[in-house]
Amino acid sequence: MIACAAVVSPAAAAEPEAASHSRWSALPVPAAALPPSVSDLAARGPHEAWATGSEQAADGQRPMLYRWDGAAWSRDTTFPGADVPGRLGKVQFVGEETWIFRTRDGAGEIMRRSAQGGWSTVPLPQALWTYQDFAAVPGAAWVVGEDSTGLKVLHYDGSRWTSQPAPDGVLYLMGITARTATDAWAWADTSTGAGTTVLHWDGARWQDAKVPLPTNSNVHTMLLEPSGRMTIVGSQYTDGVGRTYLMTWNGREWRTTYPALGDAYAAALVRGPDGALWLPVRSDRAFQSKYARVDGRRLTYSYGPERTNAIDVKPRVLATVGTSLLSFGTVEIYGSKPNLLSERLGGRP
């Protein structure tokens, strides 16, 4: 039996205080063709992080890949098809390899980078109309989306692809994440009247995990941690008005809180090096980014560095990089199109 305790944060009654101890710094990023679009940011450790997305070219979108080496960002164009239209998406670390999902010409594939820096590709067994999400761990990878027949859950075991059935009533998988080859989780839209449902893969089948999500809610993302702790974040809607919720599994029960984030989109939520949850939020200052820190019932904010003549500063994704937090996104300077930005909290100035 799964228990659920609901707790409303006292921060909801007052505007959270600014995190005065936080100091974000700007990091130079080599320019992309304008305007760029950011997909993902993931870090293996303090000396390796990858940011993906696409940039605009005359013939459409081109894949965009940047690497952080602990000191600086650099552009990586060594992967096959770097000059071919397409887009790079989610980054996963599988053993010593880096796996990146890519779409081009309507087809999907996994790009694999070895520890020595060589690239190879694993094509999907079929093209999909939509590629919703991707997850990979040692011994397994999943791509979820849709084709003309409906929902597709494609599973790769390291040598071949198979199509996995979803439970009855599941219409669409909106996201997927995995801790191991026999411990994967997904959130789905269903026709059962339950709305969003969390599913679990145990190595044999997908089934309803019976997670007691708030009524009339969706899921933005799930964080799986090696300790077994899980965090789900999403929005709950009452009379058309949304508010952000957090659910945490501590090994015994689900605990639900409602930090005073309004209806912030929290898909970029990460566990920071300080143990708190962090996410970029919409800033009330056009010339600075803004980040929220949730530590239990305590909610604080911090701002990025001031950017001269900026009219829109949008960090899109976050990653924990050793003892630092790293963000990647876009900044629009008055009179020009958006270009890339990166900011760091902690580390060398």
What do the PLM-derived regions correspond to, one by one?
Residues 1-16:
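Secretory targeting and sorting signals
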